[in-house]
């Protein structure tokens, strides 16, 4: 019998490529004993979004994934991006590296982005002591990238504990910088092509996903599949070659200390110029193929996920959206679901690209005017007007 090590756990999970598989309990496996959850979210994301700073909030959430994965050698560990935060599951042997990375990114987010990042490390064993679990599935978004799906109630419980101030991590000294190699936010917002970009969060009304909730998720997914490419917000050939100056400035802040940021911006502009020229001419630059890279951006994007509930940011027309809302509202009336939904004109993409030559670059999708954070605020009964987007 083959023994699967902690390092190989996620890679050894069976793959599924039809997104409907997120509701199949047979696709999930419990995290090994002794693992921990490294998680973070932005405190006060609501006023930041209302001030038009959602890209900063998104950047902070993605930086958690970049910092933690870089600190542990970019191993293949399950994680999920939540818009204004993130969660990474790791073997207990890597807890110290994860603590150091979380503490460093907390300082960076505060000093460079002017936001407050809440951080925690929660043992998986503690979720099981509460009668919950953290089970993980491996969804193949493309031949080159897989994303983790989480089920069992444990990640939601861990997030609640973090927000209550438990399982905290000691603060790092001022000036501490995380390793954010590969973190990128160069792309301009991606405009809706079918109607609107809609961010949806749907979680079980009774705390755990029973059959009625699974049927609801399958019904929503079935509606989205009626549109081209399952209502994917990124065109099949990738986003337009349009780049955000604010995003480039943010990326330079993330990947270079203060004294080297001008140089870093020049490097980024040079990379973008090469990309545009190679794309227009259809020629490679060494091993970098701009047209292939742009297509892979679309295929590798995480526009839908399951983390103790359904999260998706889709490009949907009015008729299909109405049917989705009707399903959700009927299920809410029966106590099957709690949900939040937010419409906006465009989507945002924040990227983790260890090397553009490799095809396993990852792209995190959210709405450009509040996305998941606004959807979550509506689920909890808060009021937040549509936020402008400072891109």
Feature-to-residue mapping (PLM):
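Regulatory and interdomain segments flanking nucleotide-handling catalytic cores
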Residues: 1-391
């Amino acid at each position: 019998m083959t023994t699967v090590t902690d390092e190989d756990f996620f890679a050894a999970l069976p793959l599924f490529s039809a997104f409907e598989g997120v509701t199949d309990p047979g696709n999930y496996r419990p995290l090994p004993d002794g693992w921990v959850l490294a998680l973070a979210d932005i405190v006060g994301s609501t006023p930041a979004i209302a001030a038009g700073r959602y890209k900063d909030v998104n950047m902070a959430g993605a930086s958690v994934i970049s910092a933690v994965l870089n600190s542990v050698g970019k191993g293949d560990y399950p994680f999920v991006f939540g818009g204004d935060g993130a969660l990474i599951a790791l073997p207990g042997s890597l807890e110290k590296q994860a603590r150091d990375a979380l503490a460093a990114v907390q300082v960076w987010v505060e000093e460079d982005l002017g936001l407050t990042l809440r951080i925690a490390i929660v043992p998986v064993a503690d979720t099981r002591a509460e009668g919950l679990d953290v089970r993980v599935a491996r969804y193949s978004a493309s031949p080159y990238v897989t994303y983790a799906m989480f089920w069992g109630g444990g990640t939601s419980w861990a997030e609640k504990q973090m927000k209550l101030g438990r399982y905290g991590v000691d603060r790092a000294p001022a000036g501490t910088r995380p390793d954010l190699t590969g973190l990128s936010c160069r792309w301009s917002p991606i405009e809706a092509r079918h109607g609107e970009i809609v961010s949806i969060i749907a979680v079980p009304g009774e705390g755990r996903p029973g059959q009625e909730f699974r049927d609801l998720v399958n019904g929503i997914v079935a509606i989205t599949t009626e549109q081209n490419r399952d209502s994917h917000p990124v065109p099949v050939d990738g986003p337009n070659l349009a780049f955000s100056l604010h995003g480039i400035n943010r990326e330079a802040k993330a990947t270079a200390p203060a004294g080297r940021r001008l140089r870093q911006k020049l490097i980024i502009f040079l990379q973008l110029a090469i990309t545009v020229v190679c794309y227009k001419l259809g020629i490679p630059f060494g091993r970098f193929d701009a047209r292939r890279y742009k297509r892979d951006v679309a295929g590798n994007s995480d526009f839908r996920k399951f983390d103790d509930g359904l999260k998706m940011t889709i490009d949907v027309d009015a008729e299909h959206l109405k049917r989705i809302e009707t399903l959700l509202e009927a299920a809410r009336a029966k106590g099957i679901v709690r949900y939040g939904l937010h419409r906006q004109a465009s989507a945002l993409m924040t990227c983790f690209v260890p090397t553009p030559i490799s095809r396993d670059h990852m792209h995190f999708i959210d709405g450009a005017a509040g996305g998941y954070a606004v959807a979550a605020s509506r689920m909890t009964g808060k009021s937040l007007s549509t936020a402008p987007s400072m891109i």
